[in-house]
UniProtKB/Swiss-Prot annotation:
This is ATP-dependent zinc metalloprotease FTSH 1, chloroplastic. Ubiquitous. It is an enzyme of class 3 (hydrolase). It is a single-pass membrane protein. The FTSH1 precursor is ubiquitinated by CHIP in the cytoplasm. Part of a complex that function as an ATP-dependent zinc metallopeptidase. Involved in the thylakoid formation and in the removal of damaged D1 in the photosystem II, preventing cell death under high-intensity light conditions. Its EC number is 3.4.24.-. HAMAP family: FtsH. The gene is FTSH1.
Length: 716
């Protein structure tokens, strides 16, 4: 009866429908109560066409439906896996799944007791989160409730693609949870790892790993491509990033320096030497007929500002041949080997333009003695000078290339660079004499409005030791002062003020000086002037001033002898007088203000006195106890290829004698200055009072005090 009832209810349910018999969706029932192992997931479908054959009119055939239901129940009872019957009426209507759940019989039962429970549950999608992106907590809850069928991990394990029991798909970003795999396994979730798919993070990682190396290689490729294909061609093509291997010399096919030998004054001998080089380039037959060879190099040597570079520009303007010019500091830069490479490139260009002139300014930057410095060794500068030596007079020679170089440090140059065959001539460009300074002043006064009272001969005599650059600066400063004072022309006052500005610095006109300090400075400077005026064979006083200039509170100007400056020869009496004059300021302070009120204003004077006295004993042989012996070396400089410090070549006893002799010379000079000031203290008072009133006294006004006071020269 139970089976007939079941068949009747089933026949009413299945009539006019497609019947699909299949295994139920896994995880619909988490813990089945039957011991069967589910292997097959086959589906059995009884199509609607079978029903239609027995019901031509399309009406439900009750007997046939009953047979279909009976067949389904029979298949369910004998199958090793539970079956599901799906009935679909219309395509738009939802499918109904009828699940047959097997139960373990406790006692023998009729045929249909195994499948007596027939139900059609539908998964509750409301228990699952909405959307395609789940939170990690939602994912764990769904796994524990059996709502997740399978998961697929990304390569890096940061993202999980899941499939729920209702075939919904979602993704979860998972943290580094070591218990996740165990949880999934305990709940029977299928686990797999993605091989072909990647997460968004993986995509960015791949893009980053590919793009940045490609950009780097692309940049290097363009760099070297540009270097090889830039103007000039080859590595280091002109204008390319590899240009550091090429010379940076300036080339002029037809030099237009705007300077000729007519613009060079005060260096007649140097001009003559270089004019011969220019004439050799213009008229080579004149010299080759006599077997003469053109000099390969001329080295211009002289103090800074004497016109070495100006002479080179004049040579370029007069020669009429291609001219290359560069500074020696341009050879050596950041990379190793650049200096030698640039030297080679420079001479390759010069040889292609021969005959030509190559001018290297400040050659001591690369031409210093090799092996210089502590421990010797090799450096980039040595490679550069070695290449320069080879190019100037090496195996291949440099026919037709004349090298001009300038330096103010010939003592540090390598001896191999100075030998004949490289620099055949060393042209000394010295400081100009009086006549030379007059010519230089005339050159630099072109284009300037000068007053009628300007006498270049007097200016030249007041500027002994000035170089051409100093005189140019003098005239320029005078023009600036005239413009500042809103004058139409430059007078002798502007030139005189500019001269003092150059020597001692600008005046501190706004400096507040107390009367006490002004009186102290006036007596200090009057002491220098008084001792200097009464010393025989000493330089005459040119000007005395107590106006602060630079770091000096006052100054006394002496006009040095032109002959003494040019020759460099100083007598013993002159040096002794110089020490006495330097000590005159301290002596005047002691005589007027007392020993307790002397100041530190004489500190520079003491340094000068000590230097002169020690040189007289150690270098000039002016000591009877030491004799005609030079004590001690000149000192070494480790960066000039010399020793770090000179080794003493005398005993401690000799050193004590030197110290005693130096002290004796200083004491003697101090006594002479004291005697002069105490003897002519009245003139000291007059000069100091005049300085307090006028602040500046020139030499002629100062000498008038001696005439009025009938002072006599003090000769010791």
């Amino acid at each position: 009866m139970a089976s007939n009832s079941l068949l009747r209810s089933s026949s009413n349910f299945f009539l006019g429908s497609h019947i699909i018999i299949s295994s139920p969706t896994p995880k619909t029932t988490r813990k089945p109560s039957f011991p069967f192992s589910f292997v097959s997931r086959a589906k059995y479908q009884i199509t609607r066409s079978s029903q239609d054959e027995n019901s031509p009119n399309g009406k439900p055939n009750s007997p046939f439906s009953s047979q279909v239901a009976l067949a389904a129940i029979l298949l369910s009872s004998i199958s090793s896996s539970p079956l599901a019957l799906a009935v679909v009426d219309e395509p738009a209507s939802p499918s109904v799944v009828i699940e047959s759940q097997a139960v373990k019989p406790s006692t023998p039962s009729p045929l249909f007791i195994q499948n007596e429970i027939l139900k059609a549950p539908s998964p509750k999608s409301s228990d699952l989160p909405e959307g395609s992106q789940w939170r990690y907590s939602e994912f764990l809850n769904a796994v524990k409730k059996g709502k997740v069928e399978r998961v697929r991990f990304s390569k890096d394990g940061s993202v999980v693609q899941l499939t729920a029991v209702d075939n919904r798909r979602a993704s979860v970003i998972v943290p580094n949870d070591p218990d996740l795999i165990d949880i999934l396994a305990m709940n029977g979730v299928d686990i797999s790892v993605s091989e072909g798919e990647s997460s968004g993070n993986d995509l960015f990682t791949v893009i980053g790993n590919l793009i940045f190396p490609l950009l780097a290689f692309g940049g290097l490729f363009l760099l070297f491509r540009r270097a090889q294909g830039g103007p000039g061609g080859g590595p280091g093509g002109l204008g390319g990033p590899m240009d550091f291997g090429r010379s940076k010399s300036k080339f002029q096919e037809v030099p237009e320096t705007g300077v000729s030998f007519a613009d060079v004054a005060g260096a007649d001998q140097a001009k003559l030497e270089l004019q011969e080089v220019v004439d050799f380039l213009k008229n080579p037959d004149k010299y080759t007929a006599l077997g003469a060879k053109i000099p390969k190099g001329c080295l211009l040597v002289g103090p800074p500002g004497t016109g070495k570079t100006l002479l080179a520009r004049a040579v370029a303007g007069e020669a009429g041949v291609p001219f290359f010019s560069c500074a020696a500091s341009e050879f050596v830069e950041l990379f190793v080997g650049v200096g030698a490479s640039r030297v080679r490139d420079l001479f390759e260009k010069a040889k292609s333009k021969a005959p030509c002139i190559v001018f290297i300014d400040e050659i001591d930057a690369v031409g210093r003695q090799r092996g210089a410095g502590m421990g010797g060794g090799n450096d980039e500068r040595e490679q550069t000078i070695n290449q320069l030596l080879t190019e100037m007079d090496g195996f291949s020679g440099n026919s037709g290339v004349i090298v001009l170089a300038a330096t103010n440090r010939p003592d540090v140059l390598d001896s191999a660079l100075l030998r004949p065959g490289r620099f055949d001539r060393q042209v000394t460009v010295d400081r100009p004499d009086v006549a030379g300074r007059v010519k230089i002043l005339q050159v630099h006064s072109r284009g300037k409005a000068l007053g009628k009272d300007v006498d270049f001969d007097k200016v030249a005599r007041r500027t002994p030791g000035f170089t051409g650059a100093d005189l140019q600066n003098l005239m320029n400063e005078a023009a600036i002062l005239a413009a500042r004072r809103e004058l139409k022309e430059i007078s002798k006052d502007e030139i005189s003020d500019a001269l003092e500005r150059i020597i001692a610095g600008p005046e501190k006109k706004n400096a507040v000086v107390s009367e006490e300090k002004k009186r102290l400075v006036a007596y200090h400077e009057a002491g220098h002037a008084l001792v200097g005026a009464l010393m025989p064979e000493y330089d005459p006083v040119a000007k005395i001033s107590i106006i602060p200039r630079g770091q000096a509170g006052g100054l006394t100007f002496f006009a040095p002898s032109e002959e003494r400056l040019e020759s460099g020869l100083y007598s013993r009496s002159y040096l002794e007088n110089q020490m006495a004059v330097a000590l005159g300021g301290r002596v005047a302070e002691e005589v007027i203000f007392g020993d307790e009120n002397v100041t530190t204003g004489a500190s520079n004077d003491f340094m000068q006195v000590s230097r002169v006295a020690r040189q007289m004993i150690e270098r000039f042989g002016f000591s009877k106890k030491i004799g005609q012996v030079a004590v001690g070396g000149p000192g070494g400089n480790p960066f000039m290829g010399q020793q770090m410090s000179s080794q003493k070549d005398y005993s401690m006893a000799t050193a004590d004698i030197v110290d005693a002799e130096v002290r004796e010379l200083v004491e003697k000079a101090y006594k002479r200055a004291t005697e002069i000031i105490t003897t002519h203290i009245d003139i000291l008072h007059k000069l100091a009072q005049l300085l307090i009133e006028k602040e500046t006294v020139d030499g002629e006004e100062f000498m008038s005090l001696f005439i009025d006071g009938q002072a006599e020269l003090y000769i010791s």
